[in-house]
């Protein structure tokens, strides 16, 4: 029986504008696309499917687009082009993702569980297990802005694995922390694998990916370079890394610069996001929107001023009425 697709990326691209200052952001609202600031394509035409029960690894050098994929997959950011289909609830595990610095560890646990739709009684029943798994001692009652990266990773991992997600996205969350906690996380991931859950594992560690994953997606400067069996793709990636590291520094810098410049080139809309053009505003629409907002502000000011005048007249009427009553009482006497 064929497995169901849990995650599907079809011709997905992600563009960022490389703003240099605040005025560039304002220009970006009004100027045509061709006259805006320089763009950067973090992802370009990415296609892959992740099936039910698979554990898939995302590998690649820095800036290859791994975290961008995990953020799109988890709904943190939208794609610029293409179609993303997620069949199930996704939980992203990354260092400090979704954690609020001023809040304590305990408060963050409650907040994240509430955001996952859990009720008070359910949260209370999960708290002891999460606190025990995180194993950060008395720091659980301290603001997490005072936590080390390892402690934040521990807390984030502990919360996410206790929300019972359909799809677990682990983004470099095992790159910090000691070996004891790492093994605890690996055991939990293997437990999820045994339950048939879908796992996407993002890491620089080829050893971790090979030991945990069935399939590997090799990302290279925003594009898919290879997809296939974990052992085969890992071997090819390892060969590339060894070859690259042997090259002179001048060659490395030139190669990386060329790849970055390539990511700045214009992108053809191979697979537009459904209904994207329907909501795209032209220059006239943007100017109309600004004028409309200005009129609304002016109208609000006039209403506020009118209320002030009405209040003044009302106060005057009350005074006149009080004087009249006093005069009547005087006449009666």
Curated annotation (Swiss-Prot):
Q: Which reaction does it catalyse?
A: ATP + H2O + teichoic acidSide 1 = ADP + phosphate + teichoic acidSide 2
Task: Extract the InterPro entries matched here.
Answer: AAA+_ATPase, ABC_transporter-like_ATP-bd, ABC_transporter-like_CS, ABC_transpr_TagH-like, Bact_Polysacc_Export_ATP-bd, P-loop_NTPase
Q: In what way does this protein cross or attach to the membrane?
A: Peripheral membrane protein
Would you tell me the Gene Ontology cellular component terms?
Answer: plasma membrane
The cross-references to SUPFAM superfamilies, in alphabetical order and at most eight, read:
P-loop containing nucleoside triphosphate hydrolases
Question: Which residues does the UniProt record annotate as the domain ABC transporter?
Answer: 26-246
Please give the Gene Ontology molecular function terms for this protein. Answer: ABC-type teichoic acid transporter activity; ATP binding; ATP hydrolysis activity
Subcellular compartments: Cell membrane
Alphabetical keyword list: ATP-binding, Cell membrane, Membrane, Nucleotide-binding, Translocase, Transport
Q: Which residues make up the binding site for ATP?
A: 60-67
Q: Which domain of life is it from?
A: Bacteria
Q: Which Pfam families match?
A: ABC_tran (PF00005)
What the entry lists under CDD domains is as follows: ABC_KpsT_Wzt (cd03220)
Give the EC number(s) under which this enzyme is classified: 7.5.2.4
Subunit (UniProt): The complex is composed of two ATP-binding proteins (TagH) and two transmembrane proteins (TagG).
What PANTHER family does UniProt report for this protein, alphabetically? TEICHOIC ACIDS EXPORT ATP-BINDING PROTEIN TAGH (PTHR46743:SF2)
Protein family (similarity comment): Belongs to the ABC transporter superfamily. Teichoic acids exporter (TC 3.A.1.104.1) family.
* Purpose: Part of the ABC transporter complex TagGH involved in teichoic acids export. Responsible for energy coupling to the transport system.
Give the protein name, as stated in the record: Teichoic acids export ATP-binding protein TagH
Per the UniProt record, the lineage of the source organism begins with:
Bacteria, Bacillati, Bacillota, Bacilli, Bacillales
